[in-house]
Amino acid sequence: MLLVIPAMLEKERPGHPGLASFRKVIAAHSFSWVGIQTTFVFLFAYLQQALPHLSDIDMGRVGSTSFLVLNAVGALLPAFVLMPIAHRIGRVKTHALSLACMTAGYIGLYLYGTSALQIYILMAVVGIGWAAIVSLPFAIVSQKVNQARMGLYMGLFNLSVVLPQLVVSLGVALFVSRAPDKGVIFAISAVSLALSAISWSMVKED
């Protein structure tokens, strides 16, 4: 947070066009990946608690189907839904709204994810944000940076994925392992995605 807040408040400086916007994108995207990685790593721990009557095989099927639903929505929405919306209202607004939907999905999982069907439905809602995350940020970054240094900026942009994964592995993992209610993973994800949506709303549309 100490690094993110200054980035979100930074203004463009003469001689460095797009640099402040790029830093805001990295900060906003980092929040997204804290929430996503928390789900990826700890969903099965939650299923063991929420669906204790299932065998290991059936629980594995529920987990696999949950991720199938998430990725199916993530694969289909960008071309058929998100891009047409982005052409009308802009990529940044579309992305922020998608993350807001993802936040709602995580809140739903935290409150109501007590059966396989409910989990599938809510994972589909979460998939709206996932669809945006795998498609829109790269297009947004490409608009904001010097095209001659695109490779450098994309490499730096990948840090907004890698560093949150380390945060989850080293910090969130310890917290979740000690939490009596594994549903806390969805609370963490909801807060992270809400912060991401708010942060993206502070990014200027080009």
PLM regions: where:
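Helix-to-loop junctions at the C-terminal end of transmembrane segments
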Residues: 77-91
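Intracellular juxtamembrane helix-capping segments at the cytosolic ends
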Residues: 132-146
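Loop-to-transmembrane helix entry
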Residues: 52-72
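C-terminal ends and interior cores of transmembrane alpha-helices
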Residues: 100-114
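Multi-pass alpha-helical transporter architecture, strongest
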Residues: 7, 167, 187-206
